[in-house]
Amino acid sequence: MEKLWGGRFQGKSEAWIDDFGASISFDQKMAKEDLAGSLAHVAMLSKCGIIPASEAAEITAGLKILQEKLALGELEFSTVNEDIHLNIEKLLHEEIGPVAGKLHTARSRNDQVATDMHLYLKQAVAEIIQSLKHLRVVLVQKAELHVETIMPGYTHLQHAQPLSFAHHLLAYFGMFTRDLERLEESVKRIDISPLGSAALAGTTFPIDRAYSAELLGFSAVYENSLDGVSDRDFIIEFLSNSSILMMHLSRFCEELILWTSHEFQFVELTDAFSTGSSIMPQKKNPDMAELIRGKTGRVYGNLFGMLTVLKGLPLAYNKDLQEDKEGMFDTLETVQTSLDIFAGMIETMKVNTEIMEESTQKDFSNATELADYLAKKGVPFREAHEIVGKLVLECTQNGIYLQDVALSHYQEINPLIEDDIYVVLSSKTAVQKRNSYGGTGFDQIKVALENTKKTL
């Protein structure tokens, strides 16, 4: 089949080489955007008097036929035509004849593909933003149910201090809020039209770039044509933002994986988000959480792959940039699906509140409470820290916990200790009293929930 760019060439191409150079297997995802860009471009060509209105009408009608066929799944693409742009132009030629060749006036595939990617990413990021907003709602709803659910807080994966489970959930709410802000802020750098930049230097035709940008719903145009066709920062930024978002999902998934284990039993995932074993009948595995954790590395790989492709590229277009799409498509799908799966897991998981709270009774996470108690009685904190540390060692040697120590022994250690110490050492009191701003105290959690609901 004759190439649309074949005038310069005498030799025939070979199918296996065509296959290697073709991108239609993946860039056909942007067929809708490519058709939209072409419709805006031909409207601009007509408005500016670059092609006759009658020819513009023919081209427009042909493009709309292709849109209808695309919606019905009736368009067939070929690797012979390399990419989505040449495939659509060839299909348009079959629909309306030689006048289709005028569509590419004042346009290059360089600004065409960049336009497609901006359009595609803009819409896809908007969908991710909606899913992220939904996840934040789910977290707040779950947190409202567990303001007074006590759980161990950890450092080094060792019991540290007791927390409200709502406090733990709202920590992730904060992370996902920053993810949301990053994505929303990035849209202004996606929402820019490169159309009209042509190959790299602009065009001699009297085009109106602002008009085509307006038709496509862009807020601005690239001020520099060379930048317009060379820029892939908007994709890198999306991949970077996605990597951070997936990292947050992965951290939470790691905790869910631990919490569903027999050793923790803090939560139970519903059957829909779990799988069994082909040999061990008793198994209920948190596979969806594990997959999100695993797919995080995949998204990181897409980011580093894109950075590596671009690191040595001179301006403007190079064939290397064909490698900018699959990582973007893959990340979009991975992030979207991961968010939806994760929100479903959180929304439906069962929280074993009694087991959570019981686990704070069989540890020394109340040791700080005793140190603070002594400090409030006038004992220098470092001295109080030393006293409590020695008492913890003594308790571990005797197989008891701080709440099991007799009052008489406490008063031998320090006569300032009174019988209110047992209330102080309870995990619920420990959580309740931490009412510094942003702390885990119940009153602070309620304030935090009211504040978060204003941002939903």
Swiss-Prot record:
It is found in: Cytoplasm. It comes from the Bacteria. It is an enzyme of class 4 (lyase). Its EC number is 4.3.2.1. Keywords: Amino-acid biosynthesis, Arginine biosynthesis, Cytoplasm, Lyase. Pathway: Amino-acid biosynthesis; L-arginine biosynthesis; L-arginine from L-ornithine and carbamoyl phosphate: step 3/3. The keyword Transmembrane does not apply. One of its GO terms (cellular component) is cytosol. PROSITE patterns: FUMARATE_LYASES (PS00163). InterPro entries: Arg_succ_lyase_C, Argininosuccinate_lyase, Fumarase/histidase_N, Fumarate_lyase_CS, Fumarate_lyase_fam, Fumarate_lyase_N, L-Aspartase-like. GO terms for molecular function: argininosuccinate lyase activity. Pfam families: ASL_C2, Lyase_1. GO terms for biological process: arginine biosynthetic process via ornithine; L-arginine biosynthetic process. It catalyses: 2-(N(omega)-L-arginino)succinate = fumarate + L-arginine. PANTHER family: ARGININOSUCCINATE LYASE. Belongs to the lyase 1 family. Argininosuccinate lyase subfamily. NCBIfam families: argH. This is Argininosuccinate lyase. The lineage of its organism: Bacteria, Bacillati, Bacillota, Bacilli, Bacillales.
